[in-house]
C-alpha cells in the first residue's frame, strides 16, 4: 500500500500533474503499473481519509496545547514509530514545521498504513503528504521538502 501512495504522490501530486483524475482511470493506471488491487484500494481509502482533514470532515485528536506539555506515545504508536521517528517528529515541532494538530494528523495517518516495515524515510514522505493536503501549511511543506531533499542530496556526494 505504501508503494502505491509513494507512486501516486510522485506521479500525480508532487509533479503537479492533473490532480482531478477519474478514480476508475486512476485504478486502471495503477493496475497497469503492476500494483495489487487490494493495495490500490487501501491507498485510495488512506488518501480519502487524509482529504477529510483538508475538507474539515475530520479533526485530529485534540490535546493540551501547553508548550511545556510532552507527547507520550502509546505502545501501538511506539511499535510503529521507533525512537528515531519520534525524535524527528519532536525536531519538526521544535523548528515549527509541525504543530500539535499536524503532528497528530501524521501519527494517525502512519498508524493507518497497512505496512509491516516503516522507517524514518517513510515517515518523512507521510509528513510531506499530510502537509501538502492541509490548507495553510504551504510554508511547512516547503521546509519539509527542503529537509527531505537536502539530506538525500547530501548522501549522494
Swiss-Prot record:
Transmembrane segments: none annotated. InterPro entries: Smg (IPR007456). It holds the Pfam family DUF494. Belongs to the Smg family. PANTHER family: PROTEIN SMG. HAMAP family: Smg. This is Protein Smg. It comes from Escherichia coli O7:K1 (strain IAI39 / ExPEC).
Amino acid at each position: 500500500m505504501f508503494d502505491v501512495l509513494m507512486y501516486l504522490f510522485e506521479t500525480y501530486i508532487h509533479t503537479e500533474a492533473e490532480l482531478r483524475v477519474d478514480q476508475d482511470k486512476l485504478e486502471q493506471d495503477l493496475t497497469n503499473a503492476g500494483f495489487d488491487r487490494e493495495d490500490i484500494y487501501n491507498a485510495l481509502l488512506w488518501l480519502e481519509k487524509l482529504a477529510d482533514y483538508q475538507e474539515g470532515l475530520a479533526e485530529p485528536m485534540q490535546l493540551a496545547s501547553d508548550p511545556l506539555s510532552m507527547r507520550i506515545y502509546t505502545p501501538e504508536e511506539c511499535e510503529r514509530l521507533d525512537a528515531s521517528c519520534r525524535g524527528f517528529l519532536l525536531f519538526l515541532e521544535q523548528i515549527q514545521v509541525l504543530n500539535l494538530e499536524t503532528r497528530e494528523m501524521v501519527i494517525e495517518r502512519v498508524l493507518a498504513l497497512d505496512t509491516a516495515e516503516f522507517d524514518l524515510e517513510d515517515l518523512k514522505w507521510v509528513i510531506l503528504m499530510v502537509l501538502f493536503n492541509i490548507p495553510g501549511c504551504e510554508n511547512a511543506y516547503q521546509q519539509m521538502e527542503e529537509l527531505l531533499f537536502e539530506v538525500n542530496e547530501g548522501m549522494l556526494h
